[in-house]
Amino acid sequence: MKKIALFITASLIAGNTLAAQTYIRNGNIYTHEGQWVAEVGAFGSTDLLKDQDKSYSALLNFGYHGEDLNADLTGINYRFFGNTGDVVNLGTYLTGSGVTYDQDSANSVKGMDKRKATIDLGLNADIALGDGTVSTYFQHDILNENKGYKTGVNYFHVIDLGAVDLVPFAGISYQSSDYNNYYFGVKDKEATAQRKAYHAGGDFSYNLGYKLAYPINDRWEITQTSSYTRLGSDVTNSPIVESANQWLVGATVAYHF
């Protein structure tokens, strides 16, 4: 299965109101502080590339979520300043970033060089505002795949509905020209009669969505996440991009221990 990884701010991470309050740390939604998690699920999304082969995939996650250190298959982050309950927390993190595709991923990229996802090193600041959190970040490619950076701000608001926790979120991000051009640009040697050469500049994207966490018991839970991303014109004007409007819907089952 060819997997297209969308660059969205929201990841499908578990939460459970029976065992712990849902909380935001280092720009992520967590529960079960101090426990391990094993998680499986699936997601479907809008096509990012024109004539894309697949726009769905399985989701697997495993890791440990601690007080300051969190490490799982989505990345590693560490809070180095501040404590739970403080207005400001600062953290650093490593995370996967970008879009992986080759010429077999979509008809629109036939004959183009393979693009690879990368690993970014970033800095994060969480600012607590009651039940809400403003989370800012800056991250840069450390493997020299796209040689670019991303920066942005997200707002999360934790709502306790009794049986479930609801976390609406919204944000804005900026992707540098190096980032956008690597993934969505078309080199002169890749141009065809149907696919013109294209250089993508830096641009903003906007996202909003929600995460719903339903605890079955103290160990098991079900989560459902939906998000919408509006891509900037420097990305959507690319001849290989399908649409500015990107939707993602996913669900997971998680076990905490």
From Swiss-Prot:
InterPro entries for the chain: MipA (IPR010583), OmpV (IPR054915)
Main localization of the protein described in the UniProt heading: membrane
Keyword Nuclease belongs to the record: no
Name of protein: Outer membrane protein Omp26La
Pfam family, one: MipA
Entry similarity comment: Belongs to the MipA/OmpV family.
Organism: Vibrio anguillarum (Listonella anguillarum)
Signal sequence annotation: 1-19
Keyword terms of this UniProt record: Cell outer membrane, Membrane, Signal
Record-level GO BP terms: peptidoglycan biosynthetic process
Subcellular location: Cell outer membrane
GO cellular component: cell outer membrane
